[in-house]
Amino acid sequence: MADGALRGYGVLVTGGGTGIGRACAEALAVDGAVVTICGRTESSLTDAVDAIRPGYGGSVHHVVADVTSEDDVRAAVAATVANAGSLRGVVANAGGGGGLGPYNVQDLGQFEAVLRLNVVGTMLCVKHSVPEMVASGGGSFVGMSSIAGHQNHPHFGAYTVAKAGIEAMMRNAADEFGRSNVRFNAIRPGFIATEMMDFVPRDGEVFASYLRNTPLAPASDTGVGEPSDVGALARFLIGPESRWITGTAINVDGGQALRAGPNFSSFIAPGLGDDVMAGNRPADD
């Protein structure tokens, strides 16, 4: 429950216009944080600013920025400091996937783009936020991973690799900057009801596999998590209650990591054929 513990905290949330990022921004602002959200689509950002109702003197601001651009990240951090007077936290939420399929058919350009968005984008946020948090006497950085970063998710291409990379970055940064009271942790969402997951038909086998492998699914009306579930954890990790937590990753997955990841082969195999799925070259290669 919000109690104003984040009053005056300057926090940057990347990818803050929709889904999980927006929920993180809301959870922070409701508790008094001065939140700056960034993303590539201004209309999504302004919609989020208009919809969020801050509390305890909090506020929400926005800046258009692409986390794969170092100049944009530098500007987003500067805007956060200008809005709040200092930087106390970052939720590096911007990310995404693409290129479903086995590794023998991965497109190099698409693979590199996913790594750049997730890993390089997060690194740029670390690079430019750390000096500001050190100047503030400390802070908290939350990297957005996924259960796909540590649990097998066949045919997810670069996404699993990218999320594992974010977790490795959070561990190393926690070790490097603990002396300056800057903490780094990762959140591992499972299936969360966001726009990004709308491509999974709710009446298909892939979604059914999520439900079968999520212990809490029968106790939920939808069987999946909500963005606010992730936002609540992000608020905790940014806040003072988590002062002695760093270098770890926390699941928000309804227990799915206890069982098995999804199998997306039903999406992919009809177009590729069993030979290609088994590792053979495509006929037109």
Write out the residue ranges for each language-model feature.
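Substrate-binding pocket helix/loop in short-chain dehydrogenase/reductase
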Residues: 101-103, 107-112, 210
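Short, small/polar-rich loop/turn modules that mediate ligand/substrate recognition or access, typified
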Residues: 178, 183, 245-247
